[in-house]
Swiss-Prot record:
The gene is rpsF. One of its GO terms (cellular component) is ribonucleoprotein complex. HAMAP family: Ribosomal_bS6. GO terms for biological process: translation. It comes from the Bacteria. GO terms for molecular function: small ribosomal subunit rRNA binding; structural constituent of ribosome. InterPro entries: Ribosomal_bS6 (IPR000529), Ribosomal_bS6_sf (IPR035980), Ribosomal_S6_plastid/chlpt (IPR020814), Transl_elong_EF1B/ribsomal_bS6 (IPR014717). This is Small ribosomal subunit protein bS6.
Length: 98
């Protein structure tokens, strides 16, 4: 089976303190690794202002992960967990070209 490259962008609530934000990012990086993904890059884009209000917030901390996976298990598990997690305002997954 061919390896697919994915990019996940997610927005963390701005009122999360640095220690909890770091733990959250490490947790989601681990979710990818535990489900067969290989992390290429995980970087913080910092706090940015939104064009419109999301859940009563006007800004959020953006984080981007790039990883490869043989199947969609890592993407599906990340998606499932990020929908449950109250600290994540939005997330988007994109399948990248080779």
């Amino acid at each position: 089976m061919a390896t697919t490259k994915y990019e996940v962008t997610y927005i963390i609530k701005p009122d999360i303190d640095e220690d909890n934000k770091k733990a959250l990012v490490e947790n989601y990086d681990k979710v990818i690794a535990d489900n067969g993904g290989t992390m290429v890059e995980s970087k913080d884009w910092g706090k940015r202002r939104f064009a419109y209000e999301i859940d009563k917030y006007r800004e959020g901390t953006y984080h981007i992960m790039t990883f490869t996976a043989d199947n969609a298990d890592a993407v599906n598990e990340f998606s499932r967990l990020s929908k449950i997690d109250n600290a994540i305002l939005r997330s988007m997954t994109v399948k990248l070209d080779k």
